[in-house]
Amino acid sequence: MSEYTISQVYPTDKTVLAQIDTLLGQEGIRRDGNLDYICAMFDEEYNVIGTGSCFGNTLRCFAVSSAHQGEGLLNQIITHLIEVQCARGNMHLFLYTKVKSSKFFGDLGFYEIAQVEDTLVFMENRRDGFGAYLRDLEKTRTEGKSAALVMNANPFTLGHQYLVEKAAAACDTLHLFVVSEDASLVPFTVRRKLVEAGVADLPNVVLHDSGPYIISNATFPSYFLKDEAAVIDGHARLDLAVFTKIAAALNITARYVGEEPASQVTGLYNQIMCEQLPKAGIECVVVPRKEANGKAISASTVRQCLQSGDWDTLETLLPKTSLDYFRSPEAEPVLARIRNAGNVVHY
């Protein structure tokens, strides 16, 4: 077999990236919008014959030229990406793949977490990673009616607080999951701290980190789904496949979501959730948004006000716990990040 080389491809290398895009296109996929490492495999004439990428702790965008399939090249590309991740300190890895490719990745030491029928499989490189996460959750399982809320809280607003209060009042135990991944302007440690402070007076709320198993729409891989509607649908169905297993571990029979009049993406997501959850015996409860100044309270409005320093409006949008934090010296690095972010609406 010929000797091929694998090397990193930088964003400035437009010629190689164009070859990669052509190769991905031949496989019916496209370059994902979220990538922080791209590699290519080259033949003796420096033609791209294979590619793969990383984002955070995930592996993405694999393809091998049809002229070279059967040579074990994808195995070499995956091995290279795993070495890159190990060098970064990422030992727990995840990937999303088409259902037909899942056996191949299974042979490379990846295990299924959940799948969306005929669409995609979510996998990790730990045999018992998700199982251990579920067993850890089970320690907080309670009798009586249990419900769930999943929120990014970027940051925690009076709207979030209202949603938690409504859900907590309707059940014996409310399991509140804060999305752990750091794809938001407000870091996870701060988001979790503000949620914890904002719900401290609700004794039946149990706070959980989502871990790597519940991800945001911002980082969901879209490269093998044909359009935005398919991406939203795929993400929602995968999230629900994961959540259904979490619900079984915690005896959850209802999931609460905030109404999304302004966001088409989240609105469609909620619609799919309300269609699918009852099939798993889980009620989907959509709570109308709390309003301030005649408008639904939104975290994006809060980020805009933090960016512009509009503290008068912030007093009508944030609970005292969040307001006190943002007025403290501790918040200065986060505020600086928000001020320098440009468009903060969809962050």
Please report, for each region that a protein language model flagged, where it lies by residue.
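Short coil/loop residues immediately preceding or within conserved phosphate-binding loops
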Residues: D36, L59, G144
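Conserved acetyl-CoA pyrophosphate-binding loop and the N-cap/start of the following alpha-helix
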Residues: H68, G72-H80, G159
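Conserved GNAT acetyl-CoA-binding A-motif
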Residues: Q85-K98
